[in-house]
Amino acid sequence: MGSLGYSISMIASLSPTLMESRLISSMGCVSMTVAPSFSSVSVVSSSLGTTRRDRTLKLRSSMSPGMVTTLDSDVGVGSSATTKKVLVPIGYGTEEIEAVVLVDVLRRAGADVTVASVEQKLEVEGSSGTRLLADVLISKCADQVYDLVALPGGMPGAVRLRDCEILEKIMKRQAEDKRLYGAISMAPAITLLPWGLLTRKRTTGHPAFFGKLPTFWAVKTNIQISGELTTSRGPGTSFQFALSLAEQLFGETTAKSIEEFLLLRDGYQNPKNKEFNSIDWSLDHTPRVLIPVANGSEAVELVSIADVLRRAKVDVTVSSVERSLRITAFQGTKIITDKLIGEAAESSYDLIILPGGHTGSERLQKSKILKKLLREQHESGRIYGATNSSSTVLHKHGLLKEKRTTVYPSESDEPMNQQMIEGAEVVIDGNVITSLGLATVTKFSLAIVSKLFGHARARSVSEGLVHEYPRQ
């Protein structure tokens, strides 16, 4: 059983004005001037004499790159021309991938995002056991006005959000004032429906809870936009969900730029995994995995890896190389780790995986304890790997000799070796696995699950995530 009283198998099986927006990637910064705009498809007069415009958003999808979603009313009217305020509430059992992706993408877009706890303390344990630290308690948000309020799902997180009276009032006011609001996964059915906020709204949600949605208005799409409301299906559609909201707030140019940084591309439809010198990774015991992290690590990567592996019944330890259990990840997400690296080093691990993030990678490289752990992992023939810029950590420690790898495509990265595999999102060479990171990290994590347990386990986990697993 997991720490929330749910077994991992249960979790896995849950089947517009000119403005400046500063886009930040983990590998550097890009500043650009953006003119947010939506293409108007038609104008329909309402009974109140106002106009309603149908708008079309075109976003590439991990499950259907040609997907088109339609806005059926005016949306995205913010509180100011330069700053968009966003609220992301979290509670005990919130789906951490969904929460962290929302925060990450919207902050990259330039939004002022507040993470608020509906519990009595700031520290909140997610549905897969990752502990997040909110910025404020929800009571601090009661009198604030937000351009967007977006609810992550997860169980029992969606129930905890539903039972918060302050949040209910905030959401109802948001809908009444016709400002943007959204929900993903279980949240549409479990949270918004009891509040009466799905009335006459086309809605989607997690397949396991789809039957709870109003039949006539429920649709099986990854993203559904109906007026001010945007809904989505699960962790595997989190990036689409967040990008859709970013586009509604900041415009298509901003959303497309972030999409490129995050590596959301056609590889989702045509997987680009490469394996060389294949060996058996299966074990006769529960796999033990160490994920070392630091200030500046990519929150999306570390949270996604831990979440996916825990769904697959892997024993995961997230360890800080800092002096504190608390780290501040890239884009400001605050995470409470399981152990300090010194304590973690007292045990041995079947896999050690380094998440990326430029600053985080530099701090991981400086850890003498981690360097020793990695050398022991290499010398014993056990598995290790990295995502994003952290492949350079392995390279500088001499752990990628004669190994084929991949790394985040950045001009600032020095060539690691002559065996870089161009175009590959995940590369496995014997007992070493590397990935481009960011939006490809779910594929990376599922590749690990497949190597440890086989395709059937990986496919089962993928279904719970609402992420398309490639046919074998």
Swiss-Prot record:
One of its GO terms (cellular component) is chloroplast. Expressed in young leaves. Residues 84-250, 287-453 form the PfpI endopeptidase domain. It comes from the Eukaryota. Keywords: Chloroplast, Plastid, Repeat, Transit peptide. Residues 1-60 form a transit peptide. GO terms for biological process: chloroplast organization. Pfam families: DJ-1_PfpI. It is found in: Plastid, Chloroplast. InterPro entries: Class_I_gatase-like, DJ-1, DJ-1/PfpI, Prot/Nucl_acid_deglycase. The keyword Chloroplast applies. Disruption phenotype: Albino phenotype and seedling lethal when homozygous. The phenotype is due to the absence of thylakoid membranes and granal stacks in plastids. The keyword Chloroplast applies. DJ1C lacks the catalytic cysteine residues in the endopeptidase domains which is a highly conserved feature of the family. However these residues are not essential for the function of DJ1C in chloroplast development. Plays an essential role in chloroplast development and is required for chloroplast integrity and viability. Belongs to the peptidase C56 family. This is Protein DJ-1 homolog C. It comes from Arabidopsis thaliana (Mouse-ear cress).
